[in-house]
Amino acid sequence: VTQTVKEKFLDLLKEQSSYEEAIGLMAWDMRTKAPKKGMDNRSEVLGVLSEKVHEIQTSDKMKSYIDELKGQDEDPVLVKSLEEAEETYNKTAKIPGKEYREYVTLQSKAESMWTEAKDKNDFESFRPYLEELVEFNKRFADYWGYKEHRYDALLHNYEPGITVSKLEEVFPRVRKALTELLDQIKKAPKQPDPSVLEGHFPKAQQEKFSEEILKRMGYDFEAGRLDETVHPFAIGLNSNDVRVTTKYDEKDFRTAVFGTIHEGGHALYEQNIDPKLTFTPLATGTSMGIHESQSLFWENFISRREAFWQNHYELFKRHAPEKFESLPLDQFYRAINEVKPSLIRIEADELTYCLHIMVRYELEKALIGEEIEVKDLPELWNKKMEEYLGVKPEMDSEGVLQDIHWAGGDFGYFPSYALGYMYAAQIEKTMSKEIDINRVIEQGDFKQIQEWLTSRIHQYGKMKKPLELLEEVTGEGLNPDYLVDYLTHKYKHIYQF
């Protein structure tokens, strides 16, 4: 049977996404269950498969199908798949193959050097690798091209449509509001007591509670599973296989509970993408920021709100150690929402989190724009942490070396976290006009919330660009005031000032 060009193109996309699914499954395995001695072999296999994907994306076949089909068909899934494939082709084709291979090798070396450097608190041993990564990223940005700022070309990889000038409109406003709020909180007479949460909380019990909450959120365990790992993540292999991982700390249940809900938010997005997008490059979240908005929506806007615990505190106490039996809900709620500037981003509370991101954004942007050099990073990092958060790292492993992102060459990624938070606040505000969120949560029924998110966001996968989606859902462009209002209102109530 002679295939049409459209069929051949869709077959090629299917081949590509099949390799990607295999890569995803291996990556999940490496980070959860794989034996230590098998790691080197596994890395080799991943390298071979990644090269296959790269070959397909940049093949003459791909190019000729794109050229032949462009403008020929009205089918929206095909049109968007072509756009996506063409953008990937152009982006990848602009980088010489030899350079790309060198870069991939450097990434894996840099990641293992970073792990060592972090353990030994030795920035100098990692510095040459980071310098090379920065040079590669500057070159790549030049290959790809940009209008105003070289950093824009890197932002585009994670958040299409976002530029330095857009960030400069919102970040300084948010920073000013948050630092002022932080000052008021530090001076507030009524401080929560986090010690009420301390004590041994067996892993098995945390796991049961976490599973129960995931089920209530609408996570489908027949299309997923919950496992343990060191750095929690969610991974969507396809919409019927979306896995969640978490980390248990028997001395602090918050790590697993809020971590699982966060990853569960990512997973719900992937589980609810329209099946007709399967085997296309559209069967995933539209951007890092929109993905993060979904995890932060569930973690902060749902599971850290009072109504959530009014409904779930009894369930929690059934699984929790005995000491919680006598702990009043009010004290519990205030303790889980304590604001305390920390050195470590992933331990940050919801108010200071954006400030951590802004430190990284300022430094990244300056590195790519050649305003600063890699050797200046530790000192500048510490200075900015003191200026924004009022805390100063004593050593680089709790400062500039804490995150893996730069070691993996992920420049331009960090702003997505803060954008996701702003998107989430804006989405929540819109939802609250249509749904009485507190009442729905108090009744313990998240179905309405999940259906709202699926119909407006999840089902579209990558069919819509992030800012287009935001505007369609909320009726306006990015507006950081919703996040500032949410945090101000919430913490005035908790800290009573």
List each language-model region with its residue ranges.
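Active-site recognition of the HExxH zinc-binding catalytic motif
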Residues: 255-274, 292-296
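Divalent metal-coordination and catalytic microenvironments
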Residues: 9, 145, 262, 295, ...
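All-alpha helical catalytic cores of prenyl diphosphate-utilizing isoprenoid enzymes
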Residues: 171, 175, 203-207, 213, ...
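A well-structured
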Residues: 1-160, 463, 488-495
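Contiguous, non-catalytic segments that form substrate-binding/exosite surfaces or channel walls
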Residues: 105-253
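Acidic/polar loop patches that form or flank catalytic/metal-binding clefts of enzymes
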Residues: 222-223, 276-280, 304-314, 374-375
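C-terminal, non-catalytic "cap/extension" segments appended to globular domains
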Residues: 5, 37, 41, 58, ...
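Post-HExxH zinc-binding segment in Zn-dependent metallohydrolases
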Residues: 284-325
